[in-house]
C-alpha cells in the first residue's frame, strides 16, 4: 500500500477508509453472481439503460480476458471487489498492478492500485482539506445550505460565509479565499445538546468523494475514518 501511495499520490489512510466502509476490509464483498445480477437489472425499466451498459462492459472485459469470470461475485447491483467497482469503473480506472494479466479486485495489490488510480483520475488532492464541522447562527435551512448530494450549490469563498458561522475564528488556519460549500445530511438542522446548530463546511476533496458515491453521509464517513486512521497509525 505504501508503494501505491507513492505512485498515485493518494494517502493510504484514504484507501483504508474506503475499503473499510465499502466491504469491511474485504470481509464482505457480496455473494451475488454479478453477471446474473446485471442481466436481470438490465430489464428494470427505471435504470435499464445504465445496467445494460454495465452488462455490456462486463461481457467485453470477460471476452478480452481482463477479468476472470469465475471470480465475479459481488453486490446485487453489480459492484465487485474490495472497493465495489462497477464494470464501467473497472474499464476506466482498474489497474493490473501485479502484472499477472488479470485485474483482480479481490487482490490487495490490484485493488489498492485501482482505487488510488480512480481517486487520482477524479481529482483528489493529497493533504488537502475535506470538511470541518461548524456551528451556524440559525437553525432553519438557509438558501446557501446543501441538503442533497446530487449537486452542491451556492459555493462561495470561505470568507463570504463568515457572518453565518459562530465559530469562524476556529477556521483561521484555512485560506479564506478557498471555494467551499456548507452541507448538512439532514433536511433540517437539528440543534445539539449545547443548543448549537451543527453543519459542515466542505472543500473540493469532499466533492471528489461524492463522485465515488453520491451520498453526503458516505463522504463524511470516509473523510472522518481517514483522519482517525491517520491519527492511529
Model-derived features: where do they sit?
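C-terminal soluble interaction/assembly domains
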Residues: 137-233
